[in-house]
């Protein structure tokens, strides 16, 4: 065993006196050396705590006999030290925990980290001042140097058995005053949960003893799948809106193109390009079928005949609506009929037996297109000639000082200044002249409409004949083509 000289301080609970006794432990049997004042101890050389023996009521430990009694009591005590140590720690645990919490609260308020003190070397002197129940008492423990001779043995630093009692380092056994808590090892930067200003959260404490920096809460996770689905839905809606807008623009452009195609077909007579089926069904330009056109033509003819015989005013109103729509078509129909008659006579005179069916069809279609293209400018020229051939109004003779009146009457427009310069009689003459012109124009319009209906009927009949001839020619051509390979 290791030899060490220690001073044991014995506290007297009744009188407040203490006595010191020196003893040495050398690991030898005390029975063999009864006269000696040495005692056996298991305190290690690294333990720097004060060994306190329980005080007796009327005796002090200064006599050698008292030392022998303590040593014998220590040797007779056979209870295992770890079990006894556990019991004592359990006794002191509630008070120690309360004191530890108070000390930790003070350290938290001061804002520095309570680091554990480094291990003391053998020979260091530590002083602890404790306040007892009756007044301030101090206990000083000095680590004696190891004994040079004797058995050296390293003991547990917490093995404090002397006389059957476990003595906590730095505590008098009989004092019931405030006790200093035994500091337990704590994890680095750790604190009791729910204590201090940063309770409920993680507090990072810098190693240099700075203030506690609370850790920021973690960012909540993002639901990327839901976000991607939402963005895809928005893109799909935008694409639908774009498609709808493009469809609208396409429909408007298609309507415009259809109008242009209708105008071109009306001008160039593209019904020959559409094939023979167009003559019995509605064309792309919206032209009605042949049977409906024939029936409407007969109804129009009867309607105009009845209206012309019954009421002239209604004829005048109808003429105003029909002039803007149908009058330009009458010379065109006349011209087209004349060209068609001339073409039929030329076809009858020529010998077409040598020509192929397809070539003859293409030739006839080209001639029809040329005739229809020339019809519109020729109709305009004819209208201008008719205007020049008209007689001047008799109002020009009544108003010699106003030569421009006749021209204004021909254009059917008079200025307010001219009307203010005229007398009532002159204005009455102009009104009567205008009524007479209206009647004559209505009669002329009725005649032209009748002619137009007749020409439409002839045109429909000719188209039916052309369709029949085309079908017959196609069948003949197929029959001839079938016979040629057979031969």
Swiss-Prot record:
Tissues and organs where the protein is expressed, per its UniProt entry: Preferentially expressed in brain, skeletal muscles and heart. Also expressed in detected in pancreas, kidney, liver, lung, and placenta.
Coiled coil residues, start to end: 424-458
Keyword presence, NADP: no
Gene Ontology annotations of biological process type: positive regulation of hippo signaling
List of residues that carry Phosphoserine: 117
Bias (Basic and acidic residues) ranges: 14-27, 107-123, 153-162, 309-323
Disordered: annotated segments: 1-74, 88-221, 236-260, 308-354
MF-aspect GO terms: identical protein binding
Regions of compositional bias (Acidic residues) in chain numbering: 92-106, 344-354
Key word Iron present: no
Biased composition (Polar residues): 242-255, 324-335
CC annotations in GO: cell junction; cytoplasm; plasma membrane
Keyword set, alphabetical order: Coiled coil, Cytoplasm, Phosphoprotein
Predominant place of localization: cytoplasm
Protein name: Schwannomin-interacting protein 1
Organism in which the protein naturally occurs: Homo sapiens
């Amino acid at each position: 065993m290791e030899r060490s000289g220690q001073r044991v301080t014995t506290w007297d609970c009744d009188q407040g006196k203490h006595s010191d006794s020196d003893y040495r432990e050398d690991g030898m049997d005390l029975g063999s050396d009864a006269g000696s004042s040495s005692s056996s101890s298991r305190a290690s050389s690294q333990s720097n705590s004060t060994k306190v023996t329980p005080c007796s009521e009327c005796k002090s430990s200064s006599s050698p006999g008292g030392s022998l009694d303590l040593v014998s009591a220590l040797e007779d005590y056979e209870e295992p030290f770890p079990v006894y140590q556990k019991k004592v720690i359990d006794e002191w645990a509630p008070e120690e925990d309360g004191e530890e919490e108070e000390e930790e609260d003070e350290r938290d308020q001061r804002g520095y980290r309570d680091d554990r003190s480094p291990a003391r070397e053998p020979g260091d002197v530590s002083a602890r001042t404790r306040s007892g129940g009756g007044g301030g008492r101090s206990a000083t423990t000095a680590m004696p140097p190891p004994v040079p001779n004797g058995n050296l043995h390293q003991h547990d630093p917490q093995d404090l058995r002397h006389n059957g009692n476990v003595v906590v380092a730095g505590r008098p056994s009989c004092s019931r005053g405030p006790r200093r808590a035994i500091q337990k090892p704590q994890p680095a930067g750790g604190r009791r949960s729910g204590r201090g200003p940063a309770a409920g959260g993680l507090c990072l404490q810098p190693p240099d003893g700075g203030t506690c920096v609370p850790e920021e809460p973690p960012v909540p996770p993002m639901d990327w799948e839901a976000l991607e689905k939402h963005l895809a839905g928005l893109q799909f809606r935008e694409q639908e809106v774009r498609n709808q807008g493009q469809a609208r623009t396409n429909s408007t452009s298609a309507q415009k193109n259809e109008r242009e195609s209708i105008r071109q077909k009306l001008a160039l007579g593209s019904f020959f390009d559409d094939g023979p089926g167009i003559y019995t069904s509605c064309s792309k330009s919206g032209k009605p079928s042949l049977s409906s056109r024939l029936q409407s033509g007969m109804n129009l003819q009867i309607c105009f005949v009845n209206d012309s015989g019954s009421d002239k005013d209604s004829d005048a109103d109808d003429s105003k609506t029909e002039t803007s729509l149908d009058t330009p078509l009458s010379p065109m129909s006349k011209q087209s009929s004349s060209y068609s008659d001339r073409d039929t006579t030329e076809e009858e005179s020529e010998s077409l037996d040598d020509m192929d069916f397809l070539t003859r069809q293409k030739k006839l279609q080209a001639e029809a297109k040329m005739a229809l293209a020339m019809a519109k400018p020729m109709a305009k020229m004819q209208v201008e000639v008719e205007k020049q051939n008209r007689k001047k109004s008799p109002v020009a003779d009544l108003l010699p000082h106003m030569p421009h009146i006749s021209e204004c009457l021909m254009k059917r427009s008079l200025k307010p200044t001219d009307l203010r310069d005229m007398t009532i009689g002159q204005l009455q003459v102009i009104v009567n002249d205008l009524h007479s012109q209206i009647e004559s124009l209505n009669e002329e319009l009725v005649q032209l409409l009748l002619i137009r209906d007749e020409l439409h009927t002839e045109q429909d009949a000719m188209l039916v004949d052309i369709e029949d001839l085309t079908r017959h020619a196609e069948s003949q051509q197929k029959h001839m083509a079938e016979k040629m390979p057979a031969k």
